[in-house]
């Protein structure tokens, strides 16, 4: 019989670190660990040696930063995708790309199974497995966290200690942290009580607003067809733009989010996020759309933004619906070109100005000075026709 070969999505965190040994022992299989680089800063050093020492027979480190920015983040930004009007979907956006990378390696290595380290009540299990089903439906999927004997992160840490598996989580600091260039999610520990304010040690990159500089930072961001192309007049690649805005935003306490969100499985969970660049760029992009999009397009696109956010959050990135919405979004973004000037100060983002060659703002129509060119007399007829339906209704059904 062919020996089983399992490709696992390997982050180097607590769950996936102990998962290598657990799977190897349970299935007597060869383990191929696959790490996708989405711009995370922590737990990426010595991953190969750590995976091999833990029992993996192979390791792949896949640089996904460029496609993550250009094919995922920018699409979500153009769509205005914020889950439940708050979360910029950093973790959710990365999952389909990580799952695709895992499938690609599994096919290359002739693996017979795919494995992930997602919990049985979280969102990521759905995102990974729906992507697997879309891209490689013939491969068997394993989800150890849904079946193994460990009932808490503390028991997982005990297993790691027993088998000399190095992990960064400790019983004193038990946070579960997921990081990529678009944002960081932090959960577990005291954060599970929604009445407990996040301890300062939970935050990974941002300065607290109280300790942020007393002098504001002014930043100018230029967009072309909805995509950021420069910061403070300097043209940059997308990755560099996000890095720069993460740096400026983190220094000024921007991007701390504390929300109760509705998970895919129906559970409400308390999530802490840090997303400086995402917060800044979504704000700037929306303000530029206010200036350049026709009224009905701007208002209708708000509905599309929620639909798009739900597609990302619910794990159906590789779907015809997302592709169809991309076509709509891309068409709306043709005039979203221009510059937005912002002030970053102690946790807040304030608009200072915006301009665009496609601006629909007409000062001669908007002004109340002598330069006013609006025909005020035309308003009477407009109002009469606009309200005619309600007037007719009220004549038949008078108010009581």
From Swiss-Prot:
Residue positions annotated to bind L-citrulline are 87, 123, 127, 176, 185, 261, 273
* Primary location group: cytoplasm
Specify which residues bind L-aspartate according to the UniProt entry for this protein.
119, 123-124
What catalytic reaction does the record list?
Answer: L-citrulline + L-aspartate + ATP = 2-(N(omega)-L-arginino)succinate + AMP + diphosphate + H(+)
Q: Please report any disulfide bonds recorded for this protein chain, giving both cysteine positions.
A: none
This protein's UniProt keywords = Amino-acid biosynthesis, Arginine biosynthesis, ATP-binding, Cytoplasm, Ligase, Nucleotide-binding
Q: Which GO terms describe its biological process?
A: argininosuccinate metabolic process; L-arginine biosynthetic process; urea cycle
What GO MF terms are annotated? argininosuccinate synthase activity; ATP binding
Q: What pathway, per the record?
A: Amino-acid biosynthesis; L-arginine biosynthesis; L-arginine from L-ornithine and carbamoyl phosphate: step 2/3
Q: Name one GO cellular component term.
A: cytoplasm
Q: Which SUPFAM superfamilies match?
A: Adenine nucleotide alpha hydrolases-like, Argininosuccinate synthetase, C-terminal domain
Tell me which residues bind ATP: 9-17, 117
- List its EC numbers: 6.3.4.5
Q: Kindly list the places in or outside the cell where this protein is found, as annotated in its UniProt entry.
A: Cytoplasm
Q: Tell me its family.
A: Belongs to the argininosuccinate synthase family. Type 1 subfamily.
Q: Which HAMAP family does this entry report, sorted A to Z?
A: Arg_succ_synth_type1 (MF_00005)
Q: How does it assemble?
A: Homotetramer.
Looking up NCBIfam families in the UniProt record yields: argG, PRK00509.1
> What protein name does the entry list?
Argininosuccinate synthase
Q: From which source organism is this entry?
A: Chlorobium luteolum (strain DSM 273 / BCRC 81028 / 2530)
Q: What is the lineage of its organism?
A: Bacteria, Pseudomonadati, Chlorobiota, Chlorobiia, Chlorobiales
């Amino acid at each position: 019989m062919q020996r089983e070969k399992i490709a696992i999505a390997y982050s180097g965190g607590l769950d996936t670190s102990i998962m290598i040994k657990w799977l190897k022992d349970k299935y007597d299989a060869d383990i191929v660990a696959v790490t996708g680089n989405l711009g995370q800063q922590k737990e990426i050093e010595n991953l190969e040696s750590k995976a091999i020492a833990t029992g993996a027979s192979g390791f792949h480190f896949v640089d996904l930063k460029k496609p993550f920015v250009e094919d995922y983040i920018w699409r979500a930004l153009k769509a205005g995708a914020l889950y439940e009007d708050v979360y910029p979907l950093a973790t959710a956006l990365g999952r389909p790309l990580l799952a695709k990378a895992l499938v690609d390696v599994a096919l290359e290595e002739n693996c017979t199974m795919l494995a992930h380290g997602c919990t049985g009540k979280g969102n990521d299990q759905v995102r990974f497995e729906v992507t697997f089903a879309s891209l490689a439906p013939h491969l068997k999927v394993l989800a150890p966290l849904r079946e193994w004997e460990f009932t808490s992160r503390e028991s997982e840490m005990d297993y790691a200690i027993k088998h000399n598996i190095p992990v960064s989580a400790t019983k004193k600091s038990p946070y579960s942290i997921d990081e990529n260039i678009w944002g960081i999610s932090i959960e577990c520990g005291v954060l599970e009580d929604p009445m407990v304010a996040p301890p300062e040690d939970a935050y990974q990159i941002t300065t607290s607003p109280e300790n942020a500089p007393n002098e504001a930072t002014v930043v100018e961001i230029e967009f072309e067809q909805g995509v950021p192309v420069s910061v403070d007049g300097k043209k940059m690649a997308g990755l560099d733009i996000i890095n720069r805005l993460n740096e400026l935003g983190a220094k000024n306490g921007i991007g701390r989010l504390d929300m109760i969100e509705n998970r895919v499985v129906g559970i409400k969970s308390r999530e802490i996020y840090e997303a400086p660049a995402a917060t800044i760029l979504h704000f700037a992009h929306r303000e530029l759309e206010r200036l350049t999009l026709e009224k009905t397009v701007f208002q209708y696109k708000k509905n599309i933004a929620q639909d798009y956010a739900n597609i990302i959050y619910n794990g159906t990135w590789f779907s015809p619906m997302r592709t169809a919405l991309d076509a709509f979004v891309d068409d709306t973004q043709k005039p979203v070109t221009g510059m937005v000037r912002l002030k970053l100060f102690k946790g807040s983002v304030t608009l200072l100005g915006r301009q665009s060659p496609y601006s629909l703002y007409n000062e001669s129509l908007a002004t109340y000075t002598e330069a006013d060119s609006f025909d005020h007399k035309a308003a009477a007829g407009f109002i009469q026709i606009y309200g005619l339906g309600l007037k007719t209704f009220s004549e038949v059904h008078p108010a009581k």
